[in-house]
């Protein structure tokens, strides 16, 4: 049956009714309008759900584009200022108008040829990435063994603990956390394990359980829109793109300024868990997952964490794992410059605090949700944690990431 026939069938079979005043739904638009007003307001000023840290996602969008080597116009900055003022006044008519204009400015941002971003190779595909790195031979792992099952249990438990801990403190500097709480060595309140650190991994697992190692980025994307109602920053825009029929890799690049933020990097663990002892396979799966919402260095962040997770099943020395993972990032990429700098700081500084301060200063132009400062904090925590989970957790918590 053709679409016109379906529509005609509905029309021909419609039976006239008289609706009561209460049944008419035009006034329901008032509630719908309030929903969209509140949702838009979050882009201009909100608080992180778990920690309460303030954030302004529209400001961060400009920051993220400039980090990626683009120049936002003076008009864009003027609109940014006006939007912040309109949001503060709750002038939603003006805020909707400014937001539309602002998004056009972001979409039309011009390449900044003077940006150091373009001094590095930008990696657009797994094939391009694969040609530039050397992977070790895969080490067979008996996935039916009790040892492997215990490793998987520990992996999930550690992620849940880390996620619960992180959501309490994310978005605050080390200095302010220290001032407010001293040394944080345990939960500051009753932990909550529901967060986006885990939900996207479960969506990947859902697609993987059906397709196995043949899983595609499209499979993962469909799992997202079927299971995850909403996201934030890169993931929110990717979900919106997918629902509009824009699939990977375009879902991660189309009007998505946040595609080098932490989102892909944070969900990499599952890719390593389903590829134990095989970092090349873990990297390939991470690329498929990453390009749903991210691109370039954002995907390399997921690759980095995925290969570390994969190697952790067959290597117990944490510094060896981190160092080997760094070697699996192309040396001409900007992401490599970040992780190698963080590693160098660790090698040269006596304390994690000293290493952190150096990284904070070097990457102060990046939002705390960007992949780069997060990667630095990971390396610092793993290096100085020396394989002790409690010590590592303490350091990463104090980093406020």
Label the model's feature ranges:
Residues 153-169, 260-267, 298, 401:
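Conserved phosphate/anionic-ligand binding catalytic regions in large, soluble enzymes, centered on
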Residues 191-231, 261:
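Aromatic-rich carbohydrate-recognition surfaces in CAZymes
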Residues 134-201:
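An N-terminal structural lobe/cap that precedes and organizes the functional/catalytic core
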Residues 130-144, 148, 239-243, 249-259, ...:
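Accessory "access/gating" subregions that flank catalytic or transport cores
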Residues 191-199, 257-263, 294-302, 367-371, ...:
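Active-site nucleophile and cofactor-binding loops and adjacent substrate-binding regions
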Residues 1-118:
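Long, charge-dense tracts
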Residues 113-132, 138-139:
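N-terminal regions that are enriched for targeting/export leaders
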Residues 217, 222-262:
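Extracytoplasmic mature domains of secreted/periplasmic and thylakoid-lumen proteins
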């Amino acid at each position: 049956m053709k679409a016109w026939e379906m529509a005609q069938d509905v029309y021909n079979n419609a039976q006239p009714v008289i609706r009561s005043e209460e049944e008419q739904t035009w006034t329901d638009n008032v509630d719908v309008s309030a929903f969209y007003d509140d949702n838009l307001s979050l882009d201009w000023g909100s608080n992180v759900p778990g920690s309460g840290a303030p954030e302004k996602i529209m400001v961060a969008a400009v920051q993220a584009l400039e980090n990626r080597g683009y120049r936002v116009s003076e008009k864009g900055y003027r609109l940014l200022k006006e939007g912040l003022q309109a949001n503060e006044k709750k002038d939603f008519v003006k805020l909707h108008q400014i937001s539309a204009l602002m998004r056009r400015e972001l979409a039309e941002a011009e390449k900044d040829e003077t940006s150091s971003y373009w001094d590095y190779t930008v990696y657009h595909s797994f094939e391009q990435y694969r040609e530039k790195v050397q992977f070790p031979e895969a080490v067979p792992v008996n996935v039916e063994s009790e040892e492997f099952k215990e490793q998987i249990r520990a992996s999930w438990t550690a992620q849940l603990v880390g996620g619960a801990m992180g959501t309490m403190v994310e978005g605050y500097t080390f200095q302010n956390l220290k001032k407010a709480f001293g040394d944080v060595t345990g939960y500051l309140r009753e932990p909550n394990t529901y967060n986006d650190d885990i939900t996207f991994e479960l969506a990947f697992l859902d697609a993987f359980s059906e397709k196995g190692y043949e899983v595609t980025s499209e499979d993962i994307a469909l799992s997202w829109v079927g299971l995850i109602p909403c996201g934030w920053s890169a993931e929110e825009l990717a979900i919106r793109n997918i629902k509009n029929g824009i699939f990977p890799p375009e879902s991660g690049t189309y009007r998505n300024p946040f595609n080098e933020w932490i989102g892909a990097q944070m969900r990499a663990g599952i890719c390593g868990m389903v590829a134990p002892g095989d970092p090349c396979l873990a990297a390939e799966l991470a690329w498929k997952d990453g390009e749903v919402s991210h691109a370039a260095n954002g995907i390399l962040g997921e690759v980095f964490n995925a290969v570390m997770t994969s190697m952790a099943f067959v290597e117990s020395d944490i510094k060896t794992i981190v160092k080997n993972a760094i070697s699996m990032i192309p040396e001409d990429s900007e992401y490599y410059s970040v992780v190698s700098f963080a590693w160098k700081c660790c090698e040269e500084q006596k304390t994690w605090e000293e290493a952190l301060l150096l990284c904070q200063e070097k990457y102060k132009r990046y939002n705390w949700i960007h992949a780069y400062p997060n990667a630095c904090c990971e390396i610092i925590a793993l290096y100085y944690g020396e394989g002790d989970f409690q010590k590592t957790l303490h350091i990463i918590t104090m980093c406020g990431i």
